[in-house]
Amino acid sequence: MRFLPGLICLLPLLSPLAHAELIDDINDRGELRIALEANTPPFNFKDGDTLTGFEVELGQLLANELDVRADFIITDEADLLQGVESGKYDVALNHIALTPELKDRFDFSEPYTQVNAQLLAKKDEQPRPLVLVQTLTEEKPKVGPPVDLAIPFQKGNPAFHASLENALQRIRTDGRLEALSQKWLNAQATENLK
């Protein structure tokens, strides 16, 4: 009987509602932890010692709109989404396509831009067999549908989702997103977006 008051005090901590919202954690830290690879110009890359690119500037704008500072964390492809899923990073800004598979694992912002699908290879990747190159050049290249790029974050954070959407909407509405797209991508960011 003497432990009953203590147990009653612990019950709220065991409740699923006791889970802290991501936006509260971000506000408490005063920073938005943004994971990226920093190796894919013009999206995000290092110019000397300076991190720059379309998504770097977008991340800074989003953090400013959330009234926190942007903390960019350079990581690799293997850790990028895993780190967001585990809570190591708040978001990933690394030209991530909004796919059904990823929608099962993450919540996403609305798309911030669209890009045409491209054949990309890493600088240090071994050359592909000539047969592949010939196959790609023999036929007329086909252009696939544009790919929506969006910002993934941990599922189950509706307050953060709303805050991120509001920040992105303000950046889109006042023309800053369009200016970034023109500067870095030579394209309109929101031309075909809903």
Residue ranges and their predicted role:
Residues 68, 72, 78, 96-102, ...:
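A conserved helix-loop-strand patch within extracytoplasmic ligand-binding domains
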